[in-house]
Amino acid sequence: EPYAFGL
C-alpha cells in the first residue's frame, strides 16, 4: 500500500 489506501 504505497499510498496508505489499502493498495
Swiss-Prot record:
It is found in: Secreted. One of its GO terms (cellular component) is extracellular region. Keywords: Amidation, Neuropeptide, Secreted. It comes from the Eukaryota. The modification Leucine amide is found at L7. Signal peptide: none annotated. GO terms for biological process: neuropeptide signaling pathway. Belongs to the allatostatin family. May act as a neurotransmitter or neuromodulator. This is Carcinustatin-3.
